[in-house]
Swiss-Prot record:
It is a multi-pass membrane protein. Its main location: membrane. One of its GO terms (cellular component) is extracellular region. It comes from Pelotomaculum thermopropionicum (strain DSM 13744 / JCM 10971 / SI). This is UPF0182 protein PTH_1387.
Length: 914
């Protein structure tokens, strides 16, 4: 009785767990539907769900039916075998003994077992097709590339949209046949093994017919597989060529055609054998195909490669190298790069510097890594605020085109004190970040700190930039769901010793509305307190999927995304802009950039409202067939770029990830001559630089410059190139970001007969300068860490100006200060407290017409001595000013006062020591 009760309890618990799992899954599906409705992408959700479930259902049913039919074919022979009786002779007595299997294997039991096994295998197999719904949809909505491959003369759209689905179908049917063969063999084996005669399986005529039939289907599928493998040659790597070279085109391709016919003949032979009953033909067919595969698919191509191609590789591979070069350039848009000549031999004058003040005033002196620490110390204000990242952008500030560093002040609930991590605080009170900090790339205070355009809470500054909607509910640090419009007001921002509270005024999130939704949210979010809280009512709104790195891919999982979404201030509101890419690994003759994909376009710009969470997708490359196909699959999802608000459009920039990929490929594929390409005679490298104290790859950098031959400064992304195994600069690549020039790439090549210093050569000259090296050593010995910033090669007219900032960071401080600027031009290398002074030292007085950088205190200059009383009085005054700024919430000013106080106290200690 106790055992029956325990068994019943286990069964009940099992059903309870299944019911709970189904309830949670159903709740998540329901709340996802509500979420997609809230962002107006319910059609996208419906398309994804219907496509995914429809494909899974079709594959699952196909798998179930085919496996079940195969198992049912074993039913009669298994029943017959299991009912065989055994005759036992003892002395002169014959005893007929029925098989024990006759009691175990019954028609009903076999039927139930076959249904259960087929259903289980179909269910498990369904997990392998997760995500293949997009392959199916692309198959249904292809777009022509307008380019045909040179081998099969098919449009590239066939390989991108059609071929993946054919491969998918082939794999599914192949697995069905293999799994069916396994379970059919297992069923026969179990019966004969129990009877003690497993070797009799293949003497069973039914089993032999069954396996022959499966083998015939397998060989027929193998023939189809060889046809698909012919197409797959276009994305393979053979010798010096990406894509099919001479061997693949003349040997491997021929081998696949012959193997296709051999596989079909083997399938036909096996079918004929069903009538001839010479079952050795099955074994012979398998042997023939295996031998042919080794000879034709392996040995023959290898022999052609070794004895024909390798001794004459360049001559025989030349036409295929041309294809490789041309198609790779197409795949990465390298064929659109405009080539220009850059003399680089000019020596700049003071007049040149004055004439290019728009460029000079936008040279970036602040690197994002040290600046992130400085922002954190000066502008995070409270421990729960966080600057997740520092972004680079450009704005019209007081009528001038300025490059700036900008960061969103997000709220990170993980940084709340342990005692403050209550449910009410984390879900209802601390719901959003607040405002941004923004500083020009080239300005600093007298203490080596950034000079802010926007700072503090609420955001204020000395410019015409204004933030009217500073709340950040959606960002990069918003990982938890929150509930707004509750009976509790939300914490808005700190103000001195008090806090300001607010209520959400947007339409983001999903209304609780009724008890059913509340219950579903409790299940899907795994939070029963949501169900019990008296602070939440029907008008409350649940904000979830708030992290943009989760929010955007939730809507468009078929796109690839850039590593750096960036914050934008537009008409007083805050937005996130994120670059999205369309990619494929099925572009013929193209070399992959990440060991997989061999085609990429920045076809989509995504904009997310930081307050409401609204997500908009804009097509930034309407010539891309992939994004056109996605537009067919999801009508109305993608908007034309022209419909983006004009002020937001001003902040579109060429994405770094795409630029790095193109630069990496262009370093090789700028060589268009097959002979030069084969020998890698003119291969370029991406340069390295000294950052902090280590040699690291040089990153592309944004800057505002007047490109050679252009009339006005513009926002561009730049990266130099160096020759292979050399350190001098050979060229630089620029990507334009402004207006109608957006997306245009220009390659500037230097004359090969002239030496143009590369980044590491400039770094070496800095290290060899005795004045600079001595000063760096003194700072290191004095307890300060010297951080060498990014080295920038700034093109001005037909010359290059190198600029590298230096930061000092005290051992006990987390706030690096910008203390020196190194400038190199021609044969001169100087280090000065400011960029203006460095330029004047190289080019003479009057090289700069405006002082955009405040004069910092020169830490090496002796100051006029003051009395101890004067110093003490000054320290008290600075301390009082700092306390006032704390009460006013001016944390940047407080940080500056602390730096001043530190210097005065150090001088006071020195005077007291005397």
């Amino acid at each position: 009785m106790r055992q029956k009760f325990r068994f019943a309890a286990y069964v009940l618990a099992g059903f309870g767990l299944i019911f709970l799992a189904l309830t949670i899954a159903g709740a998540r599906l329901y709340t996802d539907w509500l979420w997609f409705q809230s962002v107006n992408y319910q059609r996208v959700f419906a398309t994804i769900i219907i496509s995914d479930l429809g494909l899974r259902l079709a594959v699952g049913l196909t798998f179930f039916v085919l496996l079940f039919l195969n198992l049912m074919l074993t039913r009669r022979p298994l029943l017959k075998v299991s009912q065989n009786s055994a005759i036992i002779r003892e002395k002169d007595v014959l005893t007929i003994q029925s098989s024990p299997l006759s009691q175990l294997i019954t028609p009903k039991l076999l039927l139930l077992a076959f249904i259960a096994l087929s259903a289980l295998m179909a269910f498990l197999f369904n997990f392998t097709v997760a995500g293949d719904w997009i392959t199916f949809q692309k198959f249904l909505h292809p777009t022509s590339f307008g380019i045909k491959d040179p081998v099969f003369n098919l449009d590239i759209g066939f390989y991108v949209f059609k071929l993946p689905f054919y491969i998918f179908i082939y794999k599914v049917i192949n697995w069905v046949i293999l799994v069916s063969a396994f379970w059919v063999l297992a069923a026969y084996f179990v019966v004969y093994f129990i009877q003690g005669n497993p070797g009799a399986i293949f003497r069973n005529i039914s089993a032999r017919y069954h396996f022959s039939f499966l083998a015939a289907i397998f060989f027929g599928l193998k023939a189809a597989g060889y046809q698909l493998e012919q197409y797959s040659l276009l994305f393979s790597h053979h010798g010096a060529v990406w894509g099919p070279g001479y061997t693949a085109t003349h040997a491997t391709l021929l081998a696949y055609k012959v193997l296709t016919y051999i596989a079909l003949l083997c399938a036909l032979a096996i079918l004929i054998n069903l009538f001839l009953r010479r079952f050795k033909l099955v074994i012979y067919s398998i042997g023939v195909l295996l031998i042919a595969s080794v000879l034709l698919g392996g040995i023959y191509p290898a022999a052609v490669q070794k004895f024909m191609v390798t001794p004459n590789e360049i001559a025989m591979e030349r036409p295929y190298l041309e294809r490789n070069i041309n198609f790779t350039r197409l795949a990465y848009n390298l064929d659109e790069i405009e080539k220009r000549y850059f003399p680089a031999g000019r020596v700049l004058t003071a007049e040149d510097i004055r004439a290019n003040q728009d460029t000079i005033s936008n040279i970036r002196l602040w690197d994002w890594e040290p600046l992130q620490q400085t922002y954190g110390q000066l502008q995070e204000m409270r421990l729960y605020y966080e600057f997740k990242d520092i972004d680079v952008d450009r704005y019209i500030v007081n009528g001038r085109y300025r490059q700036v560093m900008v960061a969103a002040r997000e709220l990170n609930q993980e940084h709340l004190p342990a005692q403050a991590k209550t449910w009410v605080n984390q879900r209802l009170k601390f719901t959003h970040g607040y405002g941004i900090a923004m500083s020009p790339v080239n300005e600093l205070t007298g203490e080596g700190l950034p000079a802010f355009f926007l700072k503090d809470i609420p955001p204020t500054g000395p410019t015409d930039l204004q933030v009217t909607r500073p709340e950040i509910y959606y960002g990069e640090a918003s990982d938890q769901y929150v509930i707004v419009n509750t009976r509790s007001q939300e914490f808005d921002y700190p103000k001195g010793e008090e806090n300001v509270f607010s209520t959400y005024e947007g339409d983001g999130g999903v209304r609780v509305a009724n008890f059913l939704r509340r219950l579903m949210f409790a299940f899907s979010l795994g939070d029963y307190k949501l169900l019990l809280s008296s602070e939440v009512d029907n008008n409350s709104r649940v904000l979830y999927y708030r992290n943009i790195r989760q929010r955007v891919p939730k809507i468009a999982p078929f796109l690839q995304y850039d590593n750096d979404p960036y914050i934008i201030l537009s008409e007083g509101k805050l937005y996130w802009m994120w670059d999205a890419y369309t990619t494929t690994d099925k572009f013929p003759y193209s070399e992959p950039y990440n060991k997989n994909d061999n085609y990429i376009r920045n076809a989509v710009k995504v904009v997310v409202d930081a307050y409401t969470g609204k997500v908009d997708f804009y097509i930034s490359d309407s010539s891309d067939p992939l994004v056109l196909t996605y537009s067919k699959i999801f009508p109305g999802m993608f908007k034309p770029l022209d419909s983006m608000p004009e002020d937001l459009r001003r902040h579109i920039r060429y994405p770094v990830d795409l630029f790095k990929t193109q630069a990496k490929m262009y370093a090789v594929y700028h060589m268009e001559d097959p002979q030069v390409f084969y020998n890698k005679e003119d291969k370029w490298n991406l340069p390295t630089e000294i950052y902090a104290s280590e040699e690291k790859p040089m990153e592309p950098y944004y800057t505002v410059i007047k490109l050679p031959g252009e009339n006005k400064p513009e926002y561009v992304l730049i990266l130099p190139f160096t020759p292979q195994n050399k350190k001098n600069m050979i060229a630089w690549l620029a990507a334009r970001s402004d207006g109608e020039n957006y997306g245009k790439l220009i390659s500037y090549s230097f004359p090969k007969q002239e030496l143009v210093y590369g980044p590491m050569q400039v770094e070496a000259r800095i290290n060899q300068d005795t004045t600079i090296s001595q000063q760096l050593t003194l700072w290191d010995q004095g307890g300060s860490r010297v951080i060498r910033g990014n080295l920038f090669a700034v093109p001005i007219k037909d010359a290059l100006l190198y600029v590298e900032p230096l930061y000092l960071q005290a051992e006990q401080s987390r706030m690096p200060e910008l203390r020196r600027v190194i400038v190199a031009h021609g044969e001169k290398v100087v280090m000065e407290p400011t960029l203006d002074k460095a330029l004047e030292k190289i080019f003479g007085e009057g090289a700069t017409v405006q002082k955009s950088v405040q004069q910092p205190v020169d830490v090496t200059q002796p100051q006029p001595e003051k009395s101890i009383a004067e110093l003490a009085n000054t320290a008290n005054q600075i301390y009082d000013e700092a306390m006032k700024k704390i009460k006013a919430g001016d944390w940047a000013g407080y940080g500056e006062d602390l730096s001043r106080l530190k210097q005065v106290l150090a001088e006071l200690a020195e005077r007291a020591g005397k």
